[in-house]
């Protein structure tokens, strides 16, 4: 508001980033390419821009190719991640899969400092349907393990039921395995 007459070079870094994203959307691309779109921003503005990016992605439903050297950013924003080394893809998969099952030693080292419970969803370790037949105290499959850690720690059942967003039981998780990821 009030900056319509300014050139991009006259704007702050965060404002320039917003203008760049708006310009890239103006042509309504089928695939949206973003190369380090948040790299020049301070941490607070960066987080706000990431939140806005997630909101726009949900609203527009665009396929987005997002290039970043910030693995935490990739984990937060991506449905699929490609980790590259020397111009070759080492692994291309979901954040869950990359963190739980690194394909190469390079990927393992790349992910070893990541707090798995912050990345891994309940559904990533869920067994479809199975022993957990009851919906009593079921947990949502789309939740991160860190978000259900208290439930996992206090629930004595070996298998905890998992439900989808329609509250239908879709499977179960092994509590011990989940706790190993949370505290391992």
How does the language model describe each region?
Residues 6-9, 27:
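Conserved signature/switch motifs of ABC ATPase nucleotide-binding domains
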Residues 21:
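Hydrophobic anchor residue at the start of the ABC signature
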Residues 61-67:
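Conserved H-loop
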Residues 92-93, 101, 172:
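ABC ATPase "signature
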Residues 134-157, 161-166, 171-184:
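The conserved cystathionine-beta-synthase
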Residues 32-35:
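Catalytic Walker B motif of ABC-type/P-loop ATPase nucleotide-binding domains
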Residues 86-87:
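Conserved ABC ATPase "signature" C-loop
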């Amino acid at each position: 508001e009030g900056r319509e007459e300014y050139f991009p070079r006259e704007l702050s870094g965060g404002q320039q980033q917003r203008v760049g994203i708006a310009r890239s959307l103006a042509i309504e691309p089928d695939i949206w390419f973003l190369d380090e779109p948040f790299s020049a921003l301070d941490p607070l503005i960066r987080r706000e821009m990431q939140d806005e990016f997630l909101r726009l992605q949900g609203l527009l439903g665009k396929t987005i190719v997002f290039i970043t050297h910030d693995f935490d950013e990739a984990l937060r924003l991506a449905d699929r991640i490609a980790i590259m080394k020397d111009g070759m893809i080492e692994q291309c998969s979901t954040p869950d899969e990359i963190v739980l099952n690194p394909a190469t030693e390079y990927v393992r080292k790349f992910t070893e400092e990541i707090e798995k419970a912050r990345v891994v969803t309940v559904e990533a370790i869920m067994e479809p349907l199975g022993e957990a037949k009851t919906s009593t105290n079921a947990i949502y499959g789309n939740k991160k393990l860190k978000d259900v850690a208290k439930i996992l720690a206090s629930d004595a059942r070996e298998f905890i039921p998992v439900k989808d967003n329609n509250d239908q039981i879709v499977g179960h998780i092994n509590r011990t395995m989940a706790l190993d990821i949370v505290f391992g």
